[in-house]
Amino acid sequence: MSLFASLTDAAYALARPLVHATDGEAAHNLTLAALQPLPRARHALTSPMLATELAGLRFPNPVGLAPGFDKDARVAHAMPHFGFGFVEVGTLTPLPQEGNPRPRLFRLVEDRAIINRMGFNNGGQVAAAERIACLRRHGLPVPLGINIGANKDSADRIADYAKGTAAMAPLADYLTVNISSPNTPGLRALQDRGALEALLDGVAAAQPAGAAKPVFLKVAPDLEPADIDDIVAVALDRGLAAVIVSNTTVARPPLASRHAVEAGGLSGAPLAQLALQCVQDFRAASGGRLPLIAAGGIASAEQAWERIRAGASLVQVYSAMVFEGPGLASRIARGLETLAARDGFARVSDAVGAGA
């Protein structure tokens, strides 16, 4: 693990009781304020064993920052310091929106989980585009993904994704189409086959001429087998670069925290088994033809390795950092090297689907 990540982990361990005593959203905003002045990262954590290629992009290591942490692209420049091999910002909508009323973010400390009902709060694509353009001029040592969504009050949500593509694709290494948040009423209906086909056709038509960017699709974990089959069929037919499995769940396994009754999407440790099963289900449904990115409940190298062996080419983390500290990505990446060597793989990417 880098000295930078080690030092910040040590500082976070001291500050954790105070952080956990603070309102979750306020603590997050303080974290962003602390990260924003950091210098731009010039190097990424990588090695021949960790480097991974997907969708024509080179990822220095397979551990990425999930969207939601840096909604407005304010701290992407600093995140490679903490070991991330790629960074995904957003979700960004065409117009700024406040999101749902507060409180809307709850830490379930006893369960090592989070419930959120943020509702795509963000400053809009125009403001974020200015920051990302500046970042692009100075360079970033890892791929940058931009996660796009629809405004809550939009009269045409499919058109919102086309607008987002036109605005953000020129600045992105890849785009993620997020139709899986449970906190925007009706959004998950866009996972239905007909709606998904129309949405992806609109996204494709809005891509920059001659410079189309890879498109990833982020799906919910609360899907029936027939839904998975339909999504896989559409993804393969429309040439999607990958599917991200998965977003938060509306299901409620047994939880100890008093916040368990709060409405919203559940992430963190209780999501891990369901998210792993989703990777396995999408791998089986696609026959290994559709690249997958795993998210949901990953808090260790062992869990990341399990998702990779189940069929994921990359992994993303966010919620676990609240409990494990900012050096989590670095620890996972270095741990993946150890696990790959233990199991006889020359590269982590060689293990993708090895346990499927």
Curated annotation (Swiss-Prot):
Pathway: Pyrimidine metabolism; UMP biosynthesis via de novo pathway; orotate from (S)-dihydroorotate (quinone route): step 1/1. One of its GO terms (cellular component) is plasma membrane. InterPro entries: Aldolase_TIM, DHO_dehydrogenase, Dihydroorotate_DH_2, Dihydroorotate_DH_cat, Dihydroorotate_DH_CS. SUPFAM superfamilies: FMN-linked oxidoreductases. Binds 1 FMN per subunit. It is an enzyme of class 1 (oxidoreductase). The active site is at residue 181. Its cofactor is FMN. GO terms for molecular function: dihydroorotate dehydrogenase (quinone) activity. The keyword DNA-binding does not apply. PANTHER family: DIHYDROOROTATE DEHYDROGENASE (QUINONE), MITOCHONDRIAL, DIHYDROOROTATE DEHYDROGENASE (QUINONE), MITOCHONDRIAL-RELATED. Belongs to the dihydroorotate dehydrogenase family. Type 2 subfamily. This is Dihydroorotate dehydrogenase (quinone). It comes from Sphingopyxis alaskensis (strain DSM 13593 / LMG 18877 / RB2256) (Sphingomonas alaskensis).
